[in-house]
Amino acid sequence: LPVTPLAYYLGATVEIGTEQRLHADGESFALDGPKGFEATVARVLKQVFLLDCVTRTEGMYDVALYERELVESAVDLDFARLYDLPLAAQVSEYLQVPYDVLADAVPTWKLTADVVPDTAAVPVVPFLADELAVVRCPEGPGPAGESSTDLSPEVTSFFRSANGLVRSAAQRGESFARSTTRHSDGSDDLDQTVFTLQSADSIEQTYVGDGIPLGAGKMTVEEYYRRLDFDAASDGRTRVLVVCNDPEMSDENVVGDTYGTRDWIEFDISTHEGVTTDELAELLTTDADFLHYIGHVDPSGIRCADGHLDAETLDEVNVNAFLLNACQSYSQGRALVDAGAIGGIVTLTDVLNTTATEIGRSVARLLNQGFSLLSMLGLLEKRNLLAQRYMVVGDGNETLVESESGTPYAAAIDRLDAEEFEVSVDAFPTKSFPMGCIMRPHISGLNTYYVGSGRLDTYQLSQSELTDFLDMQRTPVLIDDRLCWSSEIRVSEI
C-alpha cells in the first residue's frame, strides 16, 4: 500500500521481489532506508515531486519558483538538461541527491493516510494515489494499539467530562452544553474504540479502518467511491441549509448571513428553526451543498421540535456535507455519511454552547473562503484546543466553494516595530487546486511563485504594504494565537 502513490506518480510497475527497491534507468535505489520502508518511500515521493516541479520551470511553466531558488542554492543540477531527459533518467539523477540536502525545499505535504493493512482496504488505493498521499499501515488503533482507556488522564478526561465541567441543557445558564441528557461516563455510547494515531507532518490526516481516530478524519471504501457519483448542482447555485432547533442557541444562527458573502458566487441560503422530525428528514433528502445544524444530539438521535430523528433510520441523505454542532454527535453524523452524505464535522464529546457557537461561526467563514473540511478543522485546532473535540467523518477533501485565490491561504502576523510587521503565509491545497499548483501571494513587489502547500514564506512588510495585503481578499489571520479576519483588522491596532 505505501508504495502506490509513488508508483502512480512515476508510472512505474510494482513487482513482487526479495528486496524493496526502485529501479530507474539502470540504477537501483533502496526503499528500506534507516527510517524504514514507509518513511523512505514518502521521502522518495517528496524528493521526486519537488525536483519535478523545479525541472518543469524550464518548459511551459516559465516562472520564478521559490523552490527552485532553494534547490539551486543547495545542489548543482542542470535543470535545462534534465528537462529533455526521459522520465526514468530524470528520476535516476534526482535520487543521486541526498534527501537531507533538499529537505528545507520540500513543501509541506497535503495528506497522510493511515490505512489498516487489510484486503478490504485495497479499493481505496487509487484514490490515495490520485491525491499523492503519504500512506502508512498501522497494525491497529494507534501506534501501539492504544485505546482511549490507555491514554493519559488528561486525554481521557478530554472524552469523559468530569462532573461540573459542563452543564446539561436542563441546567440553563451561560455555559450550558449542547446535550439534553447527562451521561454517566460522558460518552456517546460509541461502539468503536477512540484512539490516537501517530502524528503526521502533513496538513491533513485521514484513517481507513475500524475505530475512531483522534486528530484525524475517518474514511471508508464506500465514501471514496462516492466521489465518483458526485453530481454538482446543475444550476450552479451553492445551497446551504441552516437549522436551529434550540432558541437559546440563536446566537449561532447568524451563520446564515456568513455563508454566501462572496462576489461572483450565487448562493441559496435558507434558515429553519424548530423543525420537526419529518421536516428535518425532508431537508436531509434535499439536494443541498451543506447543512449547518445547531441544537442537541442525544442517544435517541437529533433533537427536533416533536422528538428525535435517528439518522440511522434514514434510507437516503442527499446533503453533500454538514456540521452537526451538538454534543456527542459522532454516531448521528456517521449515520448521515452512511446514508449518502459525502462528509461532515461532528463532535466526540460534550461542547459548551459558547465554544460551539464560536467554532460554528468560524466553520462557516472558513468554508465560505474555500477551505476543505479537514484543512479548516486543522486550522481551528491551532488556536482553540476545544476544536480538537470535533472531527471529520467521511471525505475531508470536500469543499463548499473555491477560494478567490484558487488555493486558500491563511496568514500569521507579528509586529516587529512601529512601522514593520512579519507576515507568514500558509497555503492549503484542495481537490480543485491540489498538490503541484503554484500561487503567488498578493504582496507588493513580489514576483515569486510557490508550490501552494504549507508554509510559503515569511515577509517583512511596512504598514501600508500590510494594509494592501489584507485588503486583497477576506482571509483568516492569526494574531497572538487568535483567529481573526483580514476584513476586520486595523493594522494600527496589531
Each PLM stretch: what is its role?
Residues L1-S152, F158, A162:
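Long, folded non-catalytic interaction modules
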Residues T4-L10, D257-G260, D338-A341, R361-S362:
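Short, solvent-exposed amphipathic alpha-helical segments in soluble enzyme
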Residues E27-K35, L284-D289, G360-R361:
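Short, surface-exposed amphipathic charged segments that create phosphate/polyanion-binding patches used
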Residues N320, N325-I494:
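Active-site-proximal C-terminal subdomain of hydrolase catalytic domains
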Residues V243-P247, V254-A335, V477-I479, L483-E493:
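Catalytic-core segments of thiol-dependent peptidases
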Residues L111, V115-F290:
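A domain-level signal for caspase-like cysteine endopeptidase catalytic cores
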Residues S28-K35, S250-D251, Q332-R334:
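Short, surface-exposed beta-strand/loop "edge" segments at domain boundaries and coil↔beta transitions
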Residues T13-E15, L291-H292, G343-T347:
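Short hydrophobic alpha-helical runs that function as membrane-insertion/retention elements
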